[in-house]
Curated annotation (Swiss-Prot):
A GO molecular function held by the record: nucleoside diphosphate phosphatase activity
Subcellular location as annotated: Secreted; Parasitophorous vacuole
Chief location category: secreted
Phenotype for residue 101 to R: In strain: Beverley
Glycosylated residues in this chain: 432
Name of this chain's protein: Nucleoside-triphosphatase 2
Disulfide links within the chain: none
Organism taxonomic ancestry: Eukaryota, Sar, Alveolata, Apicomplexa, Conoidasida
Gene coding for it: NTP1
Amino acid sequence: MWLPVYVPLLLVFGVSLSLPHGSLGTDSSSLRGVDADTEKRINVGKTHLQTLRNLETRCHDSLQALVVIDAGSSSTRTNVFLAKTRSCPNKGRSIDPDSIQLIREGKRFTGLRVVLEEWLDTYAGKDWESRPVDARLLFQYVPQMHEGAKKLMQLLEEDTVAILDSQLNEEQKVQVKALGIPVMLCSTAGVRDFHEWYRDALFVLLRHLINNPSPAHGYKFFTNPFWTRPITGAEEGLFAFITLNHLSRRLGEDPARCMIDEYGVKHCRNDLAGVVEVGGASAQIVFPLQEGTVLPSSVRAVNLQRERLLPERYPSADVVSVSFMQLGMASSAGLFLKELCSNDEFLQGGICSNPCLFKGFQQSCSAGEVEVRPDGSASVNEDVRKNRLKPLATYCSVHNPEISFKVTNEMQCRENSIDPTKPLAERMKIENCSIIEGTGNFDKCVSQVESILVAPKLPLPANIEAASSGFESVDQVFRFASSTAPMFITGREMLASIDTLKDHRLLRSDFSGDVEELAEAAREFCSSEVIIRTDGPVIQLPNARGEQKLNSLNFDLCKTMALTVSLLRHMAAGENQPSFIKWEKSIAGPDGKPLADLGWQVGVILHHVLFTEEWGRTAYEAGYSHNL
């Protein structure tokens, strides 16, 4: 008797349960006896609820700012980026990598090396580079280090806030403030060779300061030990490699690059390009290897997926990544002068004849920074910190455990005319030399750059990391490994040297890396003579090719050209040669406007945000409220 009644009740009850999750009861039969106006209001209410329910289940897009602070060898500056971020229920928050754009670079402030050296000058005492220092005693001065870090971070924070306020509209500011701003502060070669605990302590302090910004401006900065830290030379190169290939759209999940083999396994070829990045204190060389490349057992290739530089969904690639200290433009200039002018072939009667300087150019015999005056004379900065040998001379001290306990490191210093047992001033001094004169002999310049910097008998000092990768010098890189991948060369001085030769029509505008064409052009340019005009010194080119003002940026440009020629010759001598070589500062988008400068900054963002699950979790675990 109960069954005919019970079943219909179940059916009716089931329908009523489905209403909140479906159409909200749009069956017209449920509205019998209701007038048209009431029915209209009912439908409006249902539609409103359905709209709100849809909002709960759909993805939401907003803008997020990201700050990368480049703590380089000469200065510290912010790079402020903007990106589209998407949050989806049960999927976390992700960033669209193609939306990342640089909105502005900040001002240049004090480098981290200066912060540490000023602290050591005060609390370890003057000449700490030339005597034993018990580093344990310096723990008592951590509060003072904190104050020095705070002064720098206040400047960086104010500069970042000024950029955000000037570049974002009001709606964007609301979104950026609500999400918080991840900060990635990375030091490169400037403090890479700093020994003892000082460097790591400074980064603990910097992270604390980032996570506790001023509340007045409303922006909530936050970081963690993975985002704010010293990065190795190999990492710096790999991040620059990722930047290049992302901006040039070689890096991605393009189905056209993939195929499924007979076993159903997906294989994706990579069309990646290599990069040579020359900074102030170091140079990085990174390029992909072809499948089947056989490397010596001592050489370590990096797999982008295995080392968690890229997620598994990207095409797999093995790359060579090596970084050389003392091969940056500033550091190599100091080392080159020290070695060249300690050689009897070039030092006669207190005068060092430098084949990499223009004829008629003179300076005092020092590795200090040079300023070319309007009267044509060269003023050399006597400030110890402005001496381009200072970082290397500090490293090459018998009081550095890396030197005192490792004989090979001491030999490398002595090979480069630096005696670790002498005081700092003597380690930076060029013995028996008073004047440096330019001779403008480019071929001899190339041979000296080759023997001192590119293919020295012993590895350049402070290059333990490069040696651990299997390469003791640049010439070994292309002897042991090579690639047909395109190569992009970047770095201010490297670009300036090529642009200068093009400006004087010594190189074709479409120059693509022919080494003999470059050598011939540089040979003619570097044979120029310095002439003093009424409006200042100029470089007078031979064969009536015109002239160019001499200044502090181009007086030693020929050494850069020689380094480029030497580099290209070694690339050409490898088993495989690059398909083409280009010199680029940035990569342009479809509209012809630069997307961002080449360098490691975009790459370090991608390295973190492409691992979407990890990024979404970390961005909240290390968010502003976590650090209150």
